[in-house]
């Protein structure tokens, strides 16, 4: 029987990992998950984040951002955290000294203007807190979803958005390539379109995999893809 997903449970898990491997950065719990904890435990987001930080949480992923425009969120992510609460979760975490990534999933029901509106909200919060370490964008994978009739965006559109995000988000140090959704070759090309980060190894991925997109790379493949373009791989 799966245990209830409560803040005390995850605080204990984070604390156990931190005590055993204090050199490991615990990167977990996106804003939608954190807000779920607030509802399950009748706690404020400040209390939830404070407990997890005390337990050893090091950084949080930018998952669940999709497009930070409520018109889009009502159609795509109804029931998830709204735009303001997603941003405020990051704001609170950054003010606690925590760091996080920011994401954008596009190519569904959003307009081009709403993609820029999303980037502008990330940019404004970064100006305020400086807490985002990386921005990762990827194209919507429609297979096996209620929007399966949408034509998926190709490499040209993906690389164009990569370049735009690098120009627009000049206050975010790292723009990450999404080889997880685009595959190795396009992920490698992204390094020529503004990306300077190939992300990390993945042990398991279940979100885009449900839409039929599965890409896994070894450390050597990631290093080689960087070196082939004349760059020197570095771990951050």
Where are these predicted regions, by residue range?
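Single conserved hydrophobic/aromatic residue that forms the stacking wall/gate
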Residues: 2-14, 18
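Conserved strand-turn element in the central/C-terminal portion of the radical SAM core barrel
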Residues: 27-37, 68-70, 77-78, 89-114, ...
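Conserved, mostly hydrophobic/aromatic
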Residues: 60-63, 93, 122, 165, ...
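Alpha-helix N-cap and loop-to-helix initiation/capping positions
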Residues: 40-47, 77-85, 110-117, 150-157, ...
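Auxiliary Fe-S-binding modules of radical SAM enzymes
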Residues: 20-21, 126-236
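Generic structural signal for well-ordered alpha-helices
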Residues: 12-15, 49, 87-90, 119-123, ...
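Non-cysteine beta-strand/loop elements that form the S-adenosyl-L-methionine
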Residues: 25-29, 49-68, 96, 129-140, ...
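Catalytic cores of alpha/beta
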Residues: 44-48, 109-123, 182-193
């Amino acid at each position: 029987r799966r245990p209830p997903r409560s803040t005390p449970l995850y605080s204990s898990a984070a604390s156990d990992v931190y005590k055993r491997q204090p050199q490991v950065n615990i990167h977990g719990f996106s804003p939608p998950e954190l807000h779920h904890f607030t509802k399950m435990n009748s706690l404020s987001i400040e209390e939830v984040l404070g407990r997890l930080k005390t337990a050893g949480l090091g950084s949080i992923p930018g998952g669940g951002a999709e497009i930070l425009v409520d018109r889009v969120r009502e159609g795509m992510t109804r029931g998830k955290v709204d735009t303001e609460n997603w941003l405020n979760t990051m704001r609170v975490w950054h003010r606690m000294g925590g760091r996080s990534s920011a994401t954008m999933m596009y190519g569904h029901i959003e307009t081009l203007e709403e993609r820029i509106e999303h980037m502008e909200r990330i940019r404004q919060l970064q100006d305020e807190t400086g807490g985002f370490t990386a921005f990762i964008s990827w194209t919507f994978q429609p297979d096996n979803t209620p929007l399966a009739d949408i034509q998926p965006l190709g490499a040209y559109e993906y690389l164009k958005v990569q370049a735009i995000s690098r120009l627009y988000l000049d206050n975010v140090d790292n723009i990450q390539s999404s080889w997880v959704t685009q595959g190795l070759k396009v992920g490698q090309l992204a390094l020529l379109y503004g990306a300077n980060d190939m992300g990390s190894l993945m042990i398991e991925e279940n979100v885009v995999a449900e839409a039929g997109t599965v890409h896994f790379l070894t450390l050597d493949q990631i290093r080689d893809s960087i070196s082939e373009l004349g760059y020197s791989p570095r771990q951050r």
